[in-house]
UniProtKB/Swiss-Prot annotation:
Upper lineage: Bacteria, Pseudomonadati, Pseudomonadota, Alphaproteobacteria, Hyphomicrobiales
Keywords attached to this entry: Ribonucleoprotein, Ribosomal protein
SUPFAM superfamilies given in the database record: Ribosomal protein S2 (SSF52313)
Taxonomic source organism: Rhizobium etli (strain CIAT 652)
InterPro entries: Ribosomal_uS2, Ribosomal_uS2_bac/mit/plastid, Ribosomal_uS2_CS, Ribosomal_uS2_flav_dom_sf
Name of protein: Small ribosomal subunit protein uS2
Gene transcribed to yield this protein: rpsB
GO annotation (BP), single: translation
Length: 255
């Protein structure tokens, strides 16, 4: 295994270079802006390339030493991609809504996860002794908990690294990571504050093709970390149940 390759052309085809309207920018992003076209800021991909490469290395290194990566993206166009990418790389995700205290009040979250597991047991069996209405209420409770916590139910504690799409929308998640000293990899669009992020990646955080490309690369970096961890522990990768790798870079670029 090796870190995933990507090219400037793939970034261009995915629209990574398109920022927001110039009047919406955050002046702190000035070092990462190439210029503007039709009142839209153009992000400097010559900086994105090395910063993305560094972020991929951090993800791989974190997983290689047994760390957990939490993918966070709750906006409509990121939600499904975030979940799929995290699952494919045996990591964790929040893609519905960030609940306040999700990291800083882990004990309460753990109790809710235990409740989710209990509901799975109850509803997975015959669920005897419940009326139809009671069972329906339990199913609704389970569905609500699974939507909020399903992606972190097996995380077993706070993550070692967070990967975030849209730092403005996920500000609470970033604040909690800062309080706990959890490093953050994130896409920073032209309207974001890069100072909040440990490993920023300048790029479009709205276009679904761009989001798919980032998530594919981060996912494959995590898979590389798994392979390195197994290799260093002397495990036979051929005999182990490998995490499936999907060669979707081209597909992601095409949307």
């Amino acid at each position: 295994m090796a870190l995933p390759d990507f090219s400037m052309r793939q970034l261009l085809e995915a629209g990574v270079h398109f920022g927001h309207q110039t009047h919406r920018w955050n002046p702190k992003m000035k070092p990462y802006i190439f210029g503007d076209r039709n009142n839209i800021h153009i992000i400097d991909l010559a900086q994105t390339v090395p910063m993305l490469s560094r972020a991929l290395q951090v993800v791989s290194d974190t997983v290689a030493r047994g760390g957990r990566v939490l993918f966070v993206g709750t906006k409509r166009q990121a939600s499904e991609i975030i979940a799929d990418s995290a699952k494919r790389s045996a990591q964790y995700y929040v893609n519905s809504r960030w609940l306040g205290g999700m990291m800083t009040n882990w004990k309460t979250i753990s109790n809710s996860i235990q409740r989710l597991r209990k509901l799975d047991e109850i509803l997975g069996g015959e669920a005897q002794g419940f009326t139809k209405k009671e069972r329906l209420n339990l199913e609704r409770e389970r569905e609500k908990l699974d939507k909020a916590l399903g992606g972190i139910r097996d995380m077993g504690g706070t993550p070692d690294l967070m990967f975030i799409i849209d730092t403005n929308k996920e500000k609470i998640a970033i604040d909690e990571a800062k309080r706990l000293g959890i490093p953050v990899v994130a896409i920073i669009d032209s309207n974001c504050d890069p100072d909040l992020i440990d490993y920023p990646i300048p790029g479009n955080d709205d276009a679904s093709r761009a989001i798919a490309l980032y998530c594919e690369l981060i996912s494959r970096a995590a898979i590389d970390g798994i392979a390195r961890q197994q290799s260093s522990s002397g495990r036979d990768l051929g005999a182990s149940s490998e995490v499936p790798v999907e060669p979707a870079l081209e597909e992601a670029a095409e949307g």
